[in-house]
């Protein structure tokens, strides 16, 4: 029980935020080896496996340790970790791409030709149109799950009178947005949980994009009827909510179906 508690909370709140995942593995491997060493010495037993483990641990610490996970990548601009994510920024001839916790996925993209992204962000641009952005002097847009600001930048480009705010829980991703993705300086980004942010403000918006769902990783607090009611309360009378589910599954009983039913109940 004690080991389970330590193994759950110490990596989450101490070692991973302070040192990263690789060092965390080595720290806990060292602790296990130390406990094994104490046992075999106190029991006056000899164990070839323990000695081999110690040798292997030392070799990993001084010879095989690397901060880079994607050692095969040749086009990385940045690789690192945050409290929430493993982060990669890659560049090719046409794009700068952010990937989190995956080898091949794309969470944010910057097109070097300043055109459309070719991804779901382009479809989301229908939301300001439906909200009447062309006829309004100012269109207030809120992005919950701002990432590196792909949608925010597109709103500023194609709807010049839009005023965009972003909420992003991972402050390292926001830093990458400024360093590599040319996020507009006039996009205000708050480091906070999306639902908690809505609870803390009174402002209403023409468009709210909920972009916090990543594959099967769904913030439970942002997938309930109560959450979508909260979003609705922050929309203007003719406001539009857009949601990126980013998950496959068209059959009955899929998570998409359940979330659609939840939204439809509001």
Where are these regions (language model features)?
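Hydrophobic/small/kink-forming positions within alpha-helical transmembrane segments
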Residues: 5-9, 33
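Small-residue-mediated transmembrane helix hinge/kink sites in multi-pass secondary transporters
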Residues: 12-16
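Conserved beta-strand signature within the Rossmann-like core of class I S-adenosyl-L-methionine
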Residues: 238-245
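Conserved SAM-binding strand-loop segment of SAM-dependent methyltransferases
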Residues: 183-194
